[in-house]
């Protein structure tokens, strides 16, 4: 009986850990689409059911750590990219491991897109899809262990 209990407890623990990772909350490396180089580290948090993300580190070789978003057109214009909130107002879709309804900012060109986050590969990676009208682009971010 003790073996059955331990086996059931192990299965529940592993299942809970796997489910806990199917969330965008955590620390992620963004990857350059063209060079496959790690660009930055983004920390995604959740508060009151709303997900947001900030630039925690600029990791690209030669990145100016004091760079500001001069091309931004909202409240982030002229502000430091390091520490900047680039993901705003995403909410979980009922019954799915998908977060949407918010925006993502590309601080390199100041463009803002409708955002959709989907954890994949057991939560080890995150598909970040940015859309504007009929144009969309998906990046795959990698969870930092």
For the regions a language model picked out, list residue spans one by one.
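Structural motif
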Residues: 47, 120-122
């Amino acid at each position: 009986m003790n073996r059955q209990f331990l086996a059931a407890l192990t299965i529940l623990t592993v299942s809970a850990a796997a489910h806990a990772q199917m969330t965008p909350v955590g620390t992620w490396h963004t990857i350059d689409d063209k060079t496959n180089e790690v660009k930055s580290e983004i920390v995604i948090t959740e508060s009151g059911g709303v997900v947001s993300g900030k630039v925690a580190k600029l990791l690209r070789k030669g990145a100016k750590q004091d760079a500001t978003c001069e091309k931004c057109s909202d409240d982030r214009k002229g502000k430091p990219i390091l520490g900047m909130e680039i993901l705003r107002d995403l909410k979980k879709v009922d019954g799915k491991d998908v977060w949407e309804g918010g925006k993502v900012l590309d601080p390199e060109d100041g463009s803002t897109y409708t955002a959709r986050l989907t954890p994949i590969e057991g939560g080890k990676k995150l598909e970040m899809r940015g859309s504007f009208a009929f144009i969309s682009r998906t990046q795959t971010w990698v969870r930092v262990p």
